[in-house]
Amino acid sequence: MQTTRTPYSVSFMATVLLLFLFACHSTIANAAVALGATRVIYPANQKQVLLPVTNNDPASVYLIQSWIENAGDQKDTQFVITPPLFSMQGKKENTLRIINATNHQLPSDRESLFWVNVKAIPAMEKDQKNENTLQLAIISRIKMFYRPTHLAMAPEEAPAMLRFRRSGSILTLINPTPYFITVTNMKAGNSNLPNTMVPPKGEVSVDIPHAVTGDISFQTINDYGALTPLIR
């Protein structure tokens, strides 16, 4: 029996193929270019901090572009990242320098959130320039916490200070500390709740099924990207 492909089926197959190629390329690119940390802590008394970038692929060259965004996802000039653009050969490591240009304009009683963005653009081989080749740039995005000196408590003490308030199907997380608290593996009884990040001296609300009962348990992510002990 002969099967006639409709425009819909062709379009569908093309979409599936494109998504498959994107997933494969993303996996390769993410494995090739890696950052040396999952988050950056910027102490206020330092003029700069360093972030290593490594190209683990011996055969590929990448153009690396970097920039800083604020908590509102807008490019921000309060921190300068250098070099902002450079070429990276295979099996090489480079170091990004993040320089404080805030001129003491940020709050001194709590952390401030920024984002470090590093885009890896694969170089095109000469024999590919006349071909219809799909080139995908991958952006690695990690948090940067600007941390003032002489805060009222140590960051390790912050998770235990987190408080909870429930109203029906809304659970509010209240953070009285000067630190951002990244909450993960949160449960009410045996029910999983969404991961979230609570700003310093602020609060965040998440949905909780109305019928769910039980004590709240959670973990947080520390300065090194590791999980802290379970808190109940």
Identify the meaning behind each predicted range:
Residues 103-151, 157, 162, 214-232:
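Terminal connector regions
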Residues 30-53, 153-163:
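Beta-sheet-dominated interaction scaffolds and their linkers
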Residues 57-74, 176-192:
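Short acidic, flexible loop segments centered on an aromatic residue
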Residues 49-55, 98, 114-118, 170-174:
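Buried hydrophobic-core signal for structured, non-transmembrane domains
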Residues 1-9:
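N-terminal secretory signal peptides that target proteins for export/translocation
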Residues 24-26:
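N-terminal signal peptide c-region/cleavage motif recognized by signal peptidases
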Residues 73-105, 190-215:
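Intrinsically disordered, low-complexity Pro/Gly/Ser/Thr-rich segments with frequent PxxP/GP/PP motifs
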Residues 162-232:
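Intrinsically disordered, low-complexity segments enriched in serine, threonine, and glycine
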